[in-house]
C-alpha cells in the first residue's frame, strides 16, 4: 500500500486506468452522457463528482470533468464507480 508523501506530482489529478485494465473495444457516443462518478486522486483523496462519459468499455468509463480548481481533466474509472445523472 502506498502512502502519500507530499511529493506526488499533480496530487489532485484523478488516478486513471491503463488500457490493459479498461479493455480495447471502446465505444464513443456522439454526445457525451451526464454522469456522477467516484474518482480517487493521486494523493488518495476520494470525491464523487459530476462528469460526462465520453467513452466506455465493458469494464470502465472515460470521464471528462472539471477538477476542484476549475481545470478540465479526464480519467478512465471502473464502470461500477459511475451512474447516469
What does each of the following model-derived ranges do?
Residues 4-12, 16-79:
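Basic/aromatic-rich interaction segments and small domains that mediate binding to polyanionic partners
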Residues 81-85:
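Intrinsically disordered, low-complexity linker and terminal regions at domain boundaries
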